[in-house]
Regions:
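Class I SAM-dependent methyltransferase SAM/SAH-binding core
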Residues: 68-113
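Short alpha-helix
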Residues: 177-194
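Short, glycine-/aromatic-enriched active-site segment of Class I SAM-dependent methyltransferases
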Residues: 158-177
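A short glycine-rich, Lys/Arg-flanked "PGG" loop and its adjoining helix->strand segment in the class I
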Residues: 139-151
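Conserved class I S-adenosyl-L-methionine
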Residues: 1-51
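Conserved beta-strand signature within the Rossmann-like core of class I S-adenosyl-L-methionine
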Residues: 150-158
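A short SAM/SAH-binding and catalytic strip from SAM-dependent methyltransferases
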Residues: 125-136
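Class I SAM-dependent methyltransferase "Motif I" SAM/SAH-binding loop
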Residues: 63-65
Length: 215
């Protein structure tokens, strides 16, 4: 699912992950963080809205990070939330967050990747936010998602082009693999998946994709 250096990067990044939601010193850093926060906040809001009403539903949060989405959905009434992340540090943060929020009993966080997850399980909603940036084989990811989702899956894909994309490529070049997309590339990626409905929306520095199973 990921290269070793991507996994190592996110293990080291876990402790500082919350910084993207806060103000850091320096005008340039503040601008970069504001830009990324805009995308992150938009996709967070759209995902929670897309899952509503979540009462009694099940959710699989792939690349769950520190559990922001998982815990929020559990707090809103999700019956069961499973969060997967290949970075052990992120899983630890997610478990701590769930405990502090009082929803640990409905959240199951695992140090595991998508491809090792059991195909026989299925969930009402799947979430893949900030994950496709690092997936070298997106078709295989989508194929796996369709085996697991009963209702809707929500994914973000980073936009290629412009200064922010260039800056990310430069910053990540020696740290972990990074995959960016144009709208045309994204449309072509989903073209073979004719059995589902796919909606692609532009949100700041990301494409927000909703995959809906047909009744």
């Amino acid at each position: 699912m990921s290269s070793d250096r991507t996994q190592s990067f996110f293990d080291g990044y876990a402790a500082d992950f919350g910084g993207i939601y806060n103000t850091s010193p320096g005008v340039f850093k503040n601008w970069i963080n504001r830009t990324f926060r805009t995308s992150m906040m938009l996709r967070y809001a759209k995902t929670l809205e897309g899952c509503a009403p979540v009462d009694g539903k099940t959710v699989l949060d792939i690349g769950c990070g520190p559990g922001l989405y998982s815990v929020a959905l559990a707090q809103r009434g999700a019956r069961r939330v499973v969060g997967l992340d290949f970075a052990e540090g992120m899983v630890k943060l997610a478990r701590e967050r769930a405990g502090l929020a009082g929803v640990a009993g409905r959240c199951d966080f695992r140090n595991q990747d998508l491809f090792s997850f059991d195909d026989h399980e299925s969930f009402d909603y799947l979430i893949l936010m900030g994950l496709m940036d690092y997936m070298a084989e997106p078709v295989k990811v989508i194929e796996k998602v369709l085996k697991l989702v009963r209702s809707k899956a929500f994914l973000s894909f980073p936009v290629d082009g412009g200064f922010i994309a260039w800056q990310r490529k430069l910053r990540y070049r020696r740290r972990c693999d990074l995959f960016l997309y144009t709208r045309r590339q994204l449309e072509e990626l989903f073209l073979p998946f004719t059995g589902v409905d796919v909606e692609i929306e532009d949100i700041a520095q990301d494409f927000f994709v909703t995959i809906s199973q047909r009744a």
